[in-house]
């Protein structure tokens, strides 16, 4: 990845909720493929944010997707598993070893407590469900020689991530806009760029080797990602809804319209 960055080539990480999407992204030569619980919901017509609700165990869903859907069809691209590091129902160190054993090349902290704010966040933290603990789980994954990635929602979180030596940081600008199940509005792209850069600089001030990417909000098309990368220090883009959901929605509607236009 560092060689690509040195050649001024943007990195691309694609979240894939089905084997078909993963196979196509693999053939397209993307840098990393992400396998998260949200992909299963997203590609079954449910808003991605459902992955943050108590309707399924995020780690079980990801592991099942990885074993049955994603890893069997990906031939060339490293696959990263989205883990919920605060899962109280399992030994996360053993789980990480299982992730390594099935062929995952790395892990990303997702779903994450970082997405939650307000009073409920304070209550979670008071009983030990903290972002710092999530980061410590990712740090353990590094000891297993796994690539580590973390979404980030604030400058303070960025410092935790950088201090733990996590490999890639991804400032998260919120749920992706556009399509049938995306948010209708988020911060303007210039505001997203400012917030992204503030998070990146906080991380780089502690760990200059961390690789920053961008994701979410109004960064939903290549031109948006290009704007962010030209106005921040981000070296690439993480896409999920913008890679698999929105393009699929457009393509299926267009081809169906073509068939429906046939007259006898």
Model regions: which residues?
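Active-site beta-loop-alpha junctions enriched in small/polar residues
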Residues: 17-19, 38, 82-86, 112-114, ...
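Alpha-helix-loop-beta-strand connector modules within alpha/beta enzyme cores
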Residues: 46-81, 123-153, 184-212, 231-232, ...
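Catalytic cores of alpha/beta
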Residues: 18-28, 89-98, 154-165, 217-234
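Active-site beta->alpha loop and helix N-cap motifs at the rims of alpha/beta catalytic domains
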Residues: 21, 28, 32, 49-131
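Glycine-rich phosphate-binding active-site loops on the catalytic face of alpha/beta enzymes
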Residues: 32-44, 101-117, 168-183, 231-255
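Histidine/lysine/aspartate-rich catalytic loop segments that bind and position anionic ligands
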Residues: 112-136, 156-186
């Amino acid at each position: 990845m560092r060689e690509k960055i040195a050649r001024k080539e943007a990195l691309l990480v694609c979240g894939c909720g089905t084997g078909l999407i993963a196979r196509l992204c693999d053939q397209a030569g993307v840098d990393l493929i992400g396998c998260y619980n949200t992909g299963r919901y997203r590609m079954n017509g449910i808003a991605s944010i459902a992955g943050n609700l108590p309707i399924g165990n995020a780690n079980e869903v990801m592991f099942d997707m990885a074993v049955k859907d994603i890893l069997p069809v990906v031939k060339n691209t490293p696959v990263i598993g989205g883990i919920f590091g605060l899962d109280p129902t399992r030994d996360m160190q053993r789980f990480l070893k299982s992730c390594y054993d099935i062929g995952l090349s790395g892990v990303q902290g997702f779903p994450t407590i970082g997405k939650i704010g307000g009073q409920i966040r304070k209550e979670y933290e008071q009983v030990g469900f903290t972002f710092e603990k999530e980061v410590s789980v990712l740090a353990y994954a590094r000891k297993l020689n796994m690539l580590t990635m973390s979404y980030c929602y604030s400058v303070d979180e960025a410092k935790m991530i950088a201090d733990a030596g996590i490999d890639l940081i991804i400032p998260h600008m919120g749920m992706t806009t556009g399509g049938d199940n995306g948010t209708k509005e988020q911060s303007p792209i210039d505001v997203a760029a400012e917030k992204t850069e503030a998070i990146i600089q906080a991380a780089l001030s502690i760990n200059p080797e961390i690789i920053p990417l961008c994701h979410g909000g109004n960064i939903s098309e290549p031109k948006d990602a290009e704007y962010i990368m030209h106005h921040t220090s981000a070296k690439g883009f993480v896409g999920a809804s913008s890679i698999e959901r929105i393009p699929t929605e457009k393509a299926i509607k267009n081809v169906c319209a073509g068939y429906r236009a046939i007259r006898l």
